[in-house]
A protein has these predicted regions:
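PAPS-dependent sulfotransferases, especially Golgi type II membrane carbohydrate sulfotransferases
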Residues: 13, 17-19, 33, 52, ...
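PAPS-dependent sulfotransferase catalytic domain
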Residues: 1-91, 101
Length: 188
């Protein structure tokens, strides 16, 4: 769900304080500046459109929400598709790397309720509006229901702040890109 991706990316800068204390402060700041609902919405859209180009019998698509609700069943399907042996230990992953939860090396497994977090807060009506506006066709195709958020004052704020966001994000990411224009074209 692109709205859950939005919420995760909005909180990504907090990783340093949720157990990933080796992340430099500069990287946390860069993650905070990189977040904007229009940017993240466009990135999600571009990645979904790119994946849809490769739909054939050699590709298996599994929605994140489906996987975490039935991890055992979905992993068996994936292993069968890949023609590899299934082992239940494959699901014993460390619970680390979340933008919303503290790392817990003692806890293993899949968080089965780690979806639709955007419904319980964390995103404004404006963020939800832009996410759905930019992704409505792809969301519908993948079976995600629209929240029917409406254009509001906060939506206008995100629209007018977008050019400034792009400038600051480019400045903080220049060293990470070989060719700025090629990098932008690939992602949008």
């Amino acid at each position: 769900d692109p709205r859950d991706v939005l919420l995760s990316q909005k909180s990504k800068w907090k990783r340093k304080f949720l157990g990933a204390d080796k992340i430099p402060l500069k990287e946390s700041i860069r993650s905070w500046v990189n977040y904007h609902p229009i940017t993240i919405g466009k990135l999600w859209n571009a990645s979904v459109r790119a994946s849809l180009k490769f739909q054939n019998s050699n590709i298996k698509t599994v929605l994140f929400e489906e996987f975490i609700q039935c991890p055992d069943q979905k992993l068996k399907e994936i292993c069968s598709f890949l023609n590899i042996s299934y082992d239940s230990e494959m699901l014993d992953v460390e619970q680390a790397g979340s933008s919303n939860f503290r790392d817990d090396s003692k806890e293993k497994g899949i968080r089965k309720n780690n979806f639709e977090k955007w419904k319980t807060g964390g995103l404004s009506q404006g963020e939800i509006f832009w996410c759905e506006f930019l992704n409505r066709d792809e969301m519908s195709l993948l079976g995600y229901e629209l929240f029917s958020s409406k254009f509001s004052l906060i939506s206008i704020y995100y629209l007018f702040s977008f050019p400034f966001h792009i400038i600051f994000a480019l400045m903080l990411n220049l060293s990470r890109m070989n060719n700025v224009f090629s990098s932008i074209k690939k992602r949008i």
